[in-house]
A protein has these predicted regions:
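Extended substrate-binding grooves/exosites of carbohydrate-active enzymes
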Residues: 1-225, 232-253
Length: 255
């Protein structure tokens, strides 16, 4: 669909779908990596729903240009993370260290994917005209190693053993209601070298988070899940032996 015959082929395929699915059990669509290209946009006129792969930055402009299009994120995210692995500092973006593992802090990105899980969530949330998104991926899988040359992918929010990674809880905090099912998640584990500077992140669907170390408050973070760009509480603290605890509060400051 990126070439000059793209629209012609898209029209032919749409007619075949309509012939074999006269009751319209499914909608005609495609998921494209080439939505910036004019020929692809022409081909998109032939389908009923238009899918964008890693192109959330085009949503607003294309919605203005093609207000009748029904659009969605057909493939998004491609953030990478290994469960229980943390590469500090959080402010340093990377793909992997020499251990060929990706950091679960949220600072490992691919060249084509979202610049972070929070960005993936907020771009979709703020495009009110968008149907939603298909995240790449729910589970890790064998193949497509990024970084190369490991056995499996790191894209999943759940690993191949079926355990949720930290990123799983960012989505949970954004997509659930604390008034019905409150949740809070803290990372990383708390066992490092004395004095080592550690990034601590907390995810919750509640509007306020407070972090404690050995009973001492380290501060409060307020989260605006409706309109805010920052969906986590973040602290950077020197490691001290003890108990790290996070509490979530509702709008009346009730735990």
């Amino acid at each position: 669909h990126a070439g000059e015959r793209g629209r012609e082929v898209a029209r032919m395929l749409r007619k075949l779908v309509e012939r074999h699915d006269p009751k319209k059990n499914g909608l005609v669509t495609f998921g494209s990596n080439y939505m910036p290209w004019e020929n692809t946009q022409k081909a998109a006129e032939e389908v009923e729903v238009v899918g964008y792969n890693y192109a959330e930055y085009l949503y607003d402009a294309h919605h203005k240009k093609y207000p009748n299009w029904i659009i969605y994120g057909s493939e998004t995210a491609s953030t990478v993370q290994s469960r229980g692995i943390y590469h500090f500092p959080f402010s340093q973006s990377m793909l992997a260290n020499d251990d060929e593992q990706c950091s679960s802090l949220g600072n490992c990105t691919t060249s084509w994917g979202a610049k972070g899980t929070e960005r993936c969530i907020t771009d979709d949330r703020d495009a009110r005209f968008c149907l939603g998104q298909f995240i790449w991926t729910g589970f890790d899988y064998i193949g497509e190693p990024t970084p190369y040359s490991t056995k499996n992918s790191y894209f999943g929010q759940i690993d191949t053993a079926g355990f949720a990674k930290d990123s799983f809880y960012i989505y949970q905090s954004a997509w659930t209601d604390y008034r019905k099912k409150p949740m809070i998640h803290i990372l990383p584990y708390w066992d490092f070298n004395e004095g080592q500077l550690i990034d601590v992140r907390v995810f919750s669907n509640a509007p306020k988070i407070e972090l404690f170390l050995n009973g001492e408050s380290l501060g409060v973070a307020e989260i605006d899940h409706e309109n805010g760009k920052k969906l986590s509480g973040d602290w950077q603290i020197p490691y001290r032996k003890g108990i790290l605890k996070a509490l979530a509060y509702d709008e009346k400051d009730q735990v």
